[in-house]
């Protein structure tokens, strides 16, 4: 079981890395051992949401500089796992948006730790419906992309009947894919976690969760409350150093 200590001016955070996400685990450990994160900042902090770090450009960055675009020169394939939740204290990989990153590949170095909030059963029920609709739309859009040439040809031929039939076919395939993959479904355990501990359930299946805080969750709580500028960068630099926990 791999653990890493993150030292900050507000205290230490110990994170445990999941074996269920081996690519993210091994990459994070490699960077820690290389000292990649030492001297970098928690450069993006949003109260009741999360704290983000890992941008190499944040080392010795002048006050007020906008951060968040630095990277390690590579990305990682997503390692989604329905049992690994965006609960409070979850360690997750940051990434670029779906528009430029439809495969939802992770940043090679930037990460965030979830804070979030607790949800009522009614809120979770409503959120589950929204997540399912998002999942359906995502699957449908992917199928449309695969049939783009066919669709363009039908449009050129003004084949309205064919287009309507194809739309119905793709909608059925999207529903089947969502059901098969279990997308947009919130388990009883997830509902319990988000109602009791809290987190950011709307990010499940969107970003890779690859670890969790084992010690120092109170430190995460302190960091998410600090004052920030218009770019969500803390007004006082929060430098980190990371070491392996034996």
State where each predicted segment sits:
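Cyclophilin-like peptidyl-prolyl cis-trans isomerases
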Residues: 1-246
